[in-house]
Amino acid sequence: LSFRHVMGRLAKVLLENVVDREDGPRLTQQDLAAMVGTAREMVSRSLRSLEDMGAIKSEGRSLRILNPDLLRDLL
């Protein structure tokens, strides 16, 4: 699978599952990998790329979506 394809599937999972609240679900990279259907390492690389692009912000063990439109563009 191509990196771009994984990024699109990860963007979809993030848009559907990330809640920008303290009590929102805490998804591990392993959880995300299972949902996307790829290896945890690929999820880690993809999350770093999405953060570099300004789409998300990783804060400790939680994720915050900064630019949902950018994530939608990856679908």
Regions from the PLM with identified roles:
Residues 6-9, 13-75:
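Phosphate-/nucleic-acid-contacting segments
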